[in-house]
Amino acid sequence: KDLLYASPSMATTLDIWELHYLLSKLKVKEIMTKEVITVREDDSIVKAALEMAENKVGALPVLNEAGNLVGIITETDIFKIFIEMMGTRRNGVRYTFETEDRPGLIKDLSKIVYDSGGSIISFVTIPIENGRYMISFKAKNLDIDKFESSVSKMEELKLVGKYEE
């Protein structure tokens, strides 16, 4: 973003050689961000992701207790963790439901997976609107017919998607 502010306007009357000359004289210190947002090496990944999203930055310097730079965390690092958390690299079937917030719903759904011979690889809930949630989970070794027959009796669940991954 800072580089965009330093770039010449497309409406400039300078020729390409003058532009290159001016840019060659420009120093990093003249365009760098001075108020840098950082995280500590002991902070959670969730905190780092939140800071990045709220501040619209793709990377954050990571500091140790003494305030020394020890690394950098990037969007790519966050995506890698997200992929692992979602079980993307593991074979199974993913179901996504829209539902209301009901105590015991996750327990009931987990029991149906268990009773259908399955094992949950990943499970996530996402609030959407009006007290409703999206539930997305991935399971392996699932007797799909048995699972779908049992889950169809749960009126509060609306199937949004089913994907073999």
Regions found by a protein language model. Give the residues of each.
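A short, polar/charged loop-to-alpha-helix boundary motif
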Residues: 2-22, 77-91
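The conserved cystathionine-beta-synthase
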Residues: 38-56, 63, 82, 106-116
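Bateman/CBS regulatory modules and CBS-like beta-alpha motifs in cytosolic regions of diverse proteins
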Residues: 18-50, 62-63, 69, 94-102, ...
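Conserved functional loop/turn residues at catalytic and ligand-binding sites
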Residues: 2, 27, 35, 56, ...
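A conserved regulatory-domain signal marking ACT and ACT-like small-molecule sensing domains
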Residues: 82-165
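A glycine-centered beta-loop-beta connector
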Residues: 1-7, 52, 60-76
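Charged, alpha-helix-enriched surfaces in structured cytosolic catalytic cores
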Residues: 26, 73, 104, 108
